[in-house]
Amino acid sequence: MKNTSSLCLLLLVVLCSLTCNSGQAQVLFQGFNWESWKQQGGWYNMLKGQVDDIAKAGVTHVWLPPPSHSVAPQGYMPGRLYDLDASKYGTAAELKSLIAAFHGKGVQCVADVVINHRCAEKKDARGVYCVFEGGTPDDRLDWGPGMICSDDTQYSDGTGHRDTGEGFGAAPDIDHLNPRVQRELTDWLNWLKSDVGFDGWRLDFAKGYSTDIAKMYVESCKPGFVVAEIWNSLSYNGDGKPAANQDQGRQELVNWVNAVGGPAMTFDFTTKGLLQAGVQGELWRLRDGNGKAAGMIGWLPEKAVTFVDNHDTGSTQKLWPFPSDKVMQGYAYILTHPGVPCIFYDHMFDWNLKQEITALAAIRERNGINAGSKLRIVVADADAYVAVVDEKVMVKIGTRYDVGNAVPSDFHQTVHGKDYSVWEKGSLRVPAGRHL
């Protein structure tokens, strides 16, 4: 009996360990850009042909574009939420087929959820666009001006609650304190999971509603993966350069995930800003005053999704782009570091960086690097950054070629490119077709 109990306890520990590790060892892939809606034959159909390559890069979750009817073709001005056939990316059937293909490779699918604002179908008696259509034969999501925040005076009739977050000028801000809004959006979010097949969400413009609202939807729908867009600015000095201390920005990100709880994470905009400033001859920025990573990953890496660029910051919008000639330094950093790294479609396929990105992702996977991995920064100078992760992987980015004795003798270089190198501890591992 004693032996049986011990065996059961051992199995429980192993199972718990595997579950915890698998929950942390995530890699997100953004499966679209700002121009994807223009794809001949449909974006969903085109992306389906790249499922194998995406899965081979160690991706565990793919972020897909907003799925519903939208006034703007990219999907970020949604109207008839249940109408997936009106999407510029493809039909509902094509979306479900794409999701099934990803699921067949063990990759989960994340919906881009735009619920802060919504575009109306018709005008009311005042001549204001504030009468909404849900996209079904019944009255689900068929709302009027009373479902709009009262302080959104351009559209509201003044009967709703005040906005719980930041305003969005281009479309009506939805009153998430309204019980019907909460009930019907919860039903729609659950429908995306049960009927369409989505596993998680990316919350667009999550600063537009309170953390209490986000928490309510997360707890009601129980998505397996949640990452929010909390796009905040770096702190800057009077000379226009980023300040050495970026605690204010990363504290805002940490506060959001702590308030929402559960699986909720945020994109680490602090790390993105510091990394793209750092690779331009200021790599010292990547270490804070306590010797830790200077972004959100230095404080709460398990809840930070790191990225180099996305459809807003890069692509054709270029609202805050990473230096184009240094993108692989960015991937060498995020794919070897704590946090959940996000690979951007453009870099993987349009920029022909698939081989380099996949090689870095393979190092992450075979060494078990995950969101909570231990980071030890060895060098953080203007022209060189060197760090060790889990005492198994060492990475160098920057223009400096010689980092002296920073690399121990039992570490062997397995991947290198322009201004970056990665070493692994133990026996020499040389990928097929590569010569060191």
From Swiss-Prot:
<feature type="binding site">
    <location>
        <begin position="413"/>
        <end position="419"/>
    </location>
    <ligand>
        <name>substrate</name>
    </ligand>
</feature>
<dbReference type="GO" id="GO:0005509">
    <property type="term" value="F:calcium ion binding"/>
</dbReference>
<feature type="binding site">
    <location>
        <position position="163"/>
    </location>
    <ligand>
        <name>Ca(2+) 1</name>
    </ligand>
</feature>
<dbReference type="InterPro" id="IPR012850">
    <property type="entry name" value="A-amylase_bs_C"/>
</dbReference>
<dbReference type="InterPro" id="IPR006047">
    <property type="entry name" value="Glyco_hydro_13_cat_dom"/>
</dbReference>
<dbReference type="InterPro" id="IPR006046">
    <property type="entry name" value="Alpha_amylase"/>
</dbReference>
<comment type="similarity">
    <text>Belongs to the glycosyl hydrolase 13 family.</text>
</comment>
<feature type="active site" description="Nucleophile">
    <location>
        <position position="204"/>
    </location>
</feature>
<feature type="binding site">
    <location>
        <position position="152"/>
    </location>
    <ligand>
        <name>Ca(2+) 3</name>
    </ligand>
</feature>
<keyword id="KW-0326">Glycosidase</keyword>
<protein>
    <recommendedName>
        <fullName>Alpha-amylase isozyme 3D</fullName>
        <ecNumber>3.2.1.1</ecNumber>
    </recommendedName>
</protein>
<feature type="binding site">
    <location>
        <position position="292"/>
    </location>
    <ligand>
        <name>substrate</name>
    </ligand>
</feature>
<feature type="binding site">
    <location>
        <position position="168"/>
    </location>
    <ligand>
        <name>Ca(2+) 3</name>
    </ligand>
</feature>
<keyword id="KW-0732">Signal</keyword>
<dbReference type="GO" id="GO:0005983">
    <property type="term" value="P:starch catabolic process"/>
</dbReference>
<feature type="binding site">
    <location>
        <begin position="76"/>
        <end position="77"/>
    </location>
    <ligand>
        <name>substrate</name>
    </ligand>
</feature>
<feature type="binding site">
    <location>
        <position position="251"/>
    </location>
    <ligand>
        <name>substrate</name>
    </ligand>
</feature>
<comment type="subunit">
    <text>Monomer.</text>
</comment>
<dbReference type="Pfam" id="PF00128">
    <property type="entry name" value="Alpha-amylase"/>
</dbReference>
<dbReference type="GO" id="GO:0005987">
    <property type="term" value="P:sucrose catabolic process"/>
</dbReference>
<feature type="binding site">
    <location>
        <position position="396"/>
    </location>
    <ligand>
        <name>substrate</name>
    </ligand>
</feature>
<feature type="signal peptide">
    <location>
        <begin position="1"/>
        <end position="25"/>
    </location>
</feature>
<feature type="active site" description="Proton donor">
    <location>
        <position position="229"/>
    </location>
</feature>
<feature type="binding site">
    <location>
        <position position="208"/>
    </location>
    <ligand>
        <name>Ca(2+) 1</name>
    </ligand>
</feature>
<feature type="binding site">
    <location>
        <position position="317"/>
    </location>
    <ligand>
        <name>substrate</name>
    </ligand>
</feature>
<feature type="binding site">
    <location>
        <position position="231"/>
    </location>
    <ligand>
        <name>substrate</name>
    </ligand>
</feature>
<feature type="binding site">
    <location>
        <begin position="69"/>
        <end position="71"/>
    </location>
    <ligand>
        <name>substrate</name>
    </ligand>
</feature>
<keyword id="KW-0119">Carbohydrate metabolism</keyword>
<feature type="binding site">
    <location>
        <position position="142"/>
    </location>
    <ligand>
        <name>Ca(2+) 2</name>
    </ligand>
</feature>
<feature type="binding site">
    <location>
        <position position="116"/>
    </location>
    <ligand>
        <name>Ca(2+) 1</name>
    </ligand>
</feature>
<feature type="binding site">
    <location>
        <begin position="401"/>
        <end position="403"/>
    </location>
    <ligand>
        <name>substrate</name>
    </ligand>
</feature>
<feature type="binding site">
    <location>
        <position position="171"/>
    </location>
    <ligand>
        <name>Ca(2+) 3</name>
    </ligand>
</feature>
<feature type="binding site">
    <location>
        <position position="173"/>
    </location>
    <ligand>
        <name>Ca(2+) 3</name>
    </ligand>
</feature>
<feature type="binding site">
    <location>
        <position position="136"/>
    </location>
    <ligand>
        <name>Ca(2+) 2</name>
    </ligand>
</feature>
<feature type="binding site">
    <location>
        <begin position="202"/>
        <end position="207"/>
    </location>
    <ligand>
        <name>substrate</name>
    </ligand>
</feature>
<feature type="site" description="Transition state stabilizer">
    <location>
        <position position="312"/>
    </location>
</feature>
<feature type="binding site">
    <location>
        <position position="423"/>
    </location>
    <ligand>
        <name>substrate</name>
    </ligand>
</feature>
<feature type="binding site">
    <location>
        <position position="311"/>
    </location>
    <ligand>
        <name>substrate</name>
    </ligand>
</feature>
<dbReference type="GO" id="GO:0004556">
    <property type="term" value="F:alpha-amylase activity"/>
</dbReference>
<dbReference type="InterPro" id="IPR017853">
    <property type="entry name" value="Glycoside_hydrolase_SF"/>
</dbReference>
<keyword id="KW-0106">Calcium</keyword>
<dbReference type="Pfam" id="PF07821">
    <property type="entry name" value="Alpha-amyl_C2"/>
</dbReference>
